[in-house]
């Protein structure tokens, strides 16, 4: 990449024009080195655990610790390359590792870290069609308690495999 700015976006994420503009303006302004945005799901607000609690908890964590959801990350290209980019050792959660590395290199270079709160990006809830709240909970708890599982492809099947119907 030869551009001065990089934006990483999931193919199934919708970015409101003003969110995109905030990211580009922040990077072009020179004070911000990297950032992300809060998110909402495009469906299933009635599912309390997976449709409301998990996205809300993620938004709180991402605001508090400035960790970026993989659905929308923006940064200065030189900072991305300086920090080594995405880790190739992780099958999931690589955006968390990248967030931490980008924050560190941004601050080292005197740049701010930005979290866009409004409007949030709209992320796909399609996995809620595939998994029940209980199934999601059974997949998430081991990953939270043992993050080394993020380096195990089988443990990260939730992000890659569509379950088969019996």
Task: Name each model-derived stretch.
Residues 3, 30-32, 111:
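Short, high-confidence coil segments that cap the C-terminus of an alpha-helix
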Residues 10-14:
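The conserved acidic donor/metal-binding loop of glycosyltransferases
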Residues 39-46, 56-75:
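A recurrent flexible, glycine/aromatic-enriched loop bordering the glycosyltransferase active site
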Residues 6:
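Short aromatic/hydrophobic "clamp" motif used to bind/position activated sugar donors
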Residues 79-83, 89-110:
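A short, conserved alpha-helix in the catalytic core of glycosyltransferases
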Residues 2-3, 69-83:
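Conserved nucleotide-sugar donor-binding
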Residues 103-166:
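Hydrophobic helical membrane-anchoring modules
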Residues 17-46:
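Conserved donor NDP-sugar-binding/catalytic core segment of glycosyltransferases
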């Amino acid at each position: 990449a030869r551009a001065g700015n990089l934006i990483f976006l999931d193919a199934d994420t919708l970015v409101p024009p003003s969110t995109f503009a905030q990211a580009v303006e922040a990077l072009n302004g020179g004070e911000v080195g990297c950032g992300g945005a809060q998110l909402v799901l495009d469906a299933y607000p009635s599912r309390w655990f997976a449709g409301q609690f998990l996205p809300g908890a993620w938004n709180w964590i991402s605001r508090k610790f400035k960790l970026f959801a993989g659905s929308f990350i923006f940064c200065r290209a030189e900072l991305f390359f300086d920090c080594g980019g995405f880790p190739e050792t992780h099958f999931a959660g690589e955006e968390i590792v990248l967030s931490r590395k980008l924050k560190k290199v941004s601050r080292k270079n005197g740049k701010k870290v930005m979290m866009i709160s409004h409007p949030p990006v709209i992320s796909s809830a399609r996995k809620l069609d595939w998994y029940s709240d209980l199934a999601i909970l059974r997949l998430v708890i081991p990953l939270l308690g043992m993050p080394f599982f993020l380096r195990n492809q089988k443990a990260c099947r939730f992000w890659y495999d569509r379950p088969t119907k019996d």
